[in-house]
C-alpha cells in the first residue's frame, strides 16, 4: 500500500483531475486502449470506435470511473485528516 505521504501526493494532484472528471476519465481510457489494445475486448461498446475523442459514451464511462476513484480518494483524505487531528490532540494532551 501507499504511505501516508504518498497518499497525500496523490490527493494533492487530484484537485487538478477533479476539475474535469469526464475529460480526464476519457483520456485515461484512451491511453489504456492505445497502450493495451487487448483491454478493448472487455468493452463491447467501445470495440469499434472510429474516434475516441468524439465518443460521448467513452466520456460518460470515463466520468463513472473517475467518480468511483474520487470516492476512494475522499474516503482516504478523511482518514488522513482524522488521524492527523487525533495525533495533534494527543500531542496537546487532550487524549489520555
UniProtKB/Swiss-Prot annotation:
Its EC number is 1.7.-.-, 1.11.1.-. The modification Phosphoserine is found at residue 3. Keywords: Cytoplasm, Heme, Iron, Metal-binding, Muscle protein, Oxidoreductase, Oxygen transport, Phosphoprotein, Transport. The modification Phosphothreonine is found at residue 64. One of its GO terms (molecular function) is heme binding. O2 binds at residue 61. GO terms for cellular component: extracellular exosome; sarcoplasm. The keyword Transport applies. It comes from the Eukaryota. Monomeric. Belongs to the globin family. Monomeric heme protein which primary function is to store oxygen and facilitate its diffusion within muscle tissues. Reversibly binds oxygen through a pentacoordinated heme iron and enables its timely and efficient release as needed during periods of heightened demand. Depending on the oxidative conditions of tissues and cells, and in addition to its ability to bind oxygen, it also has a nitrite reductase activity whereby it regulates the production of bioactive nitric oxide. This is Myoglobin. It comes from Ailuropoda melanoleuca. The lineage of its organism: Eukaryota, Metazoa, Chordata, Craniata, Vertebrata.
